Structures are given as structure tokens and as C-alpha cells.
């Protein structure tokens, strides 16, 4: 399932809050920082409903929205898509790119080394 950048802002509100949220709550949490109007957020909610990324249930005169798509699943799909598009699905070139272009701290390097050691142990 492909989620646009704007839709991901709405999803982040639902993931962060965890409990079902009203449209008004979502507007209040997302719209000001993005410069959006209420109608924009409602449009994004409708798109997410059609994609079955969220569900809505009636609560009196309003609807409460909750995430169906788990954040971990979304992050995994987006990460895989980026890796496939830019690096042919290979992690090595991604790490090489970041090590060449970004200032990796000693902590970053230690975390990468620890991850590689853990992966190496798991493969044995």
C-alpha cells in the first residue's frame, strides 16, 4: 500500500496517539504545522479510508479514526521501496553512500558494527 507524504502526516498522528481520534483532534494535531485547512485533512482521511490504512467508527455525531496499517509495516515497506529504487535492493551501497556523504559519528559507526556482528551471529 502506497501512502503519500501528506497521508503519512495523518498516519503519524494516529500512530502517536494510539487511541481512536476524532477528525477534529486530527485536524488540531496535523493542520497547523502543515498550514492545512480542515478540508485538506478530511480529504486525506477519506483517501486513507479508501486504501484501508485506517478505519472509522461512528461515535454519536462524529467519527473516530484508528490506524489499521501498523507503523512498523509502513516503515518496512517504505525502506524496501527506497532500497529497491535507489540501490537495486542492496544494503551495502546504501551504507557506503551514507558513510561517504554524511558525517557518521563514532556512535553511528558503533551501531552499524554491532548490527553487522548481530547479523553475522544470526547467520551461523
Where do the PLM segments sit?
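Short, cationic-aromatic polyanion-contact patches
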Residues: 3-6, 59-78
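Short beta-strand "wing" residues that participate in macromolecule-binding interfaces
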Residues: 56
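Amphipathic alpha-helical dimerization/coiled-coil segments
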Residues: 77-122
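Pre-recognition alpha-helix immediately N-terminal to the DNA-recognition helix
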Residues: 8-13, 25
